[in-house]
């Protein structure tokens, strides 16, 4: 996954532990356990971007598209500067067969996000993680056409491993 403007916020020890544990569980393919860990974050920190992003990444792995879309829509309102939520919302809408709405989300994204290729890059990551290698290859190709520097990131990104093996 490639992020822009990633500036982590300080978290309580409880939330830091939950985020690290959830990431570990997700890496091991244990999405339900990861979701349990995210649920253990401090309530006062539940709307922080890193917590919202982590929760939505788990929901993506679980294929809970309606929840992904709703949480991403909320997160876009709370944190409009975070591009990841736009990508997540568009992807969830795409998976729910609401392509027109997905395109409207992408069209509504700030111009600077659309110019960087980050939307296509992150869509490639999601598709690769969910096993649609053909679509992932198309998305990463578009991203690289928009920004050649993404080629280097793509080759070392663990989310895109399936494209290069």
How should these model regions be labeled?
Residues 7, 40-41, 74-75, 108-109, ...:
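Canonical positions in the second alpha-helix
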Residues 11-44, 50-61:
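Alpha-helical segment of the N-proximal tetratricopeptide repeat
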Residues 2-6, 145, 149-165:
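Terminal, low-structured helical/coil segments at or just beyond the last alpha-helical repeat
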Residues 16, 20, 54, 88, ...:
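"A position-specific structural signal for the A-helix of alpha-solenoid helical repeats
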Residues 49-118, 126:
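Alpha-helical adaptor scaffolds
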